[in-house]
Amino acid sequence: MDYILVLAKVYPKSGCKDTVIELSDDLIENTLCEEGNIDYQLLKSLNDNTLTFIEKWQSLDALKEHMASSHFQLFGSETEDFVEKMDIQVIGAEELNL
């Protein structure tokens, strides 16, 4: 199965990680209901102050629709004062059946 994999690493400002996590709840809940979404998780690093969204999408078009969604846009505006930066990787992937 081919899909789009997104690794979005979030660098919260000092003392803001819990706020970003709380603000992620609605984003995650709404995204999991989107057509074309396969998986959407938020992971907290054990080693540093980073958070990582791991996303799987059926297509690039589904990802683009997600990025245009109201809940994605709201998350961006709600968290902009709490985040230093984000690094986003978008990968076209094919599962290997080993």
Feature annotation, model-predicted:
Residues 5-10:
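Active-site-flanking beta-strand signature of metal-NTP-handling nucleotidyl enzymes
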Residues 2-4, 42-47, 77-98:
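Glycine-rich beta-strand-turn "strand-cap" elements at beta-sheet edges
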Residues 29-52:
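Short, glycine- and small/hydrophobic-rich beta-strand elements in well-ordered beta-sheets
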Residues 2-4, 21, 59-64, 96:
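N-proximal accessory regions
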Residues 31-38, 56-90:
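An amphipathic, aromatic/His-enriched active-site/gating alpha helix that lines ligand/cofactor pockets
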Residues 11-17:
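Short, surface-exposed ligand-recognition loops at beta-strand->loop->(often short) alpha-helix junctions
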